[in-house]
């Protein structure tokens, strides 16, 4: 073990191999990866960032660059390997917009988190690409809009179909009242 490091800070070969396999599985099953530089973030900052990312259904992991590069080899995200320099962390999610939104919003309020880039599928994205992705609505927002658009015509048709029946009922009601008034 290296001098000055605790057992927890040094990974043995089997742990490294398991971590590379874990990341390779993640990169094989996710649609979006964002690479950030987290130099100078406090524990409280990282905890808050992880909480926000978890709430968005994403994951944030600090990884050794060499191990992350090995995990990237042969995956659709291997184009982001050059971004892995310095103290970096990876965030990933199935919903591309959600992870990008959380990272970009957090970076606006905390200048110690720097977005380096990322990838959406096999397409490598720069900082501007990640920021543009953050402007898009999330999958849940898109689903809600789609359901609303699908329901709107049905609601209008139901309103049109019900309107004549209501009008007829009012006309019959008026005739009935008029007939009662004449009979009295």
Swiss-Prot record:
Query: Which CDD domains is this protein grouped with?
Result: Ribosomal_L10
Question: Does rRNA-binding count among this protein's keywords?
Answer: yes
Q: Which GO biological process annotations does it have?
A: translation
Q: Which domain of life is it from?
A: Bacteria
- What is a GO molecular function of this protein? large ribosomal subunit rRNA binding
Known PANTHER family for this protein?
39S RIBOSOMAL PROTEIN L10, MITOCHONDRIAL (PTHR11560)
Database matches in HAMAP family: Ribosomal_uL10 (MF_00362)
Q: What does this protein do?
A: Forms part of the ribosomal stalk, playing a central role in the interaction of the ribosome with GTP-bound translation factors.
The protein depicted here goes by the name Large ribosomal subunit protein uL10
């Amino acid at each position: 073990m290296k001098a000055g490091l605790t057992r927890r800070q040094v990974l043995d070969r089997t742990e490294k191999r398991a971590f590379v396999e874990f990341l390779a599985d993640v990169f094989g099953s996710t649609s979006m990866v964002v690479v950030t530089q987290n130099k100078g973030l406090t524990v409280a900052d990282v905890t808050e960032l992880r909480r926000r990312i978890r709430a968005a259904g994403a994951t944030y992991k600090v990884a050794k660059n060499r191990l992350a590069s090995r995990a990237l080899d042969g995956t659709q995200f291997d184009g982001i390997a050059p971004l892995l320099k310095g103290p970096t962390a990876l965030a990933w999610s199935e919903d591309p917009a959600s992870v990008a939104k959380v990272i970009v919003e957090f970076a606006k309020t905390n200048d110690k988190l720097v977005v380096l880039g990322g990838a959406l599928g096999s397409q490598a994205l720069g900082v501007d690409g990640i920021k543009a992705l953050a402007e898009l609505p999330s999958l849940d927002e898109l689903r809600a809009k789609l359901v609303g658009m699908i329901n709107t015509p049905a609601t209008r048709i139901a309103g049109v179909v019900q309107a004549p029946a209501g009008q007829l009922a009012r006309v019959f009601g008026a005739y009935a009242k008029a007939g009662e008034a004449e009979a009295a």
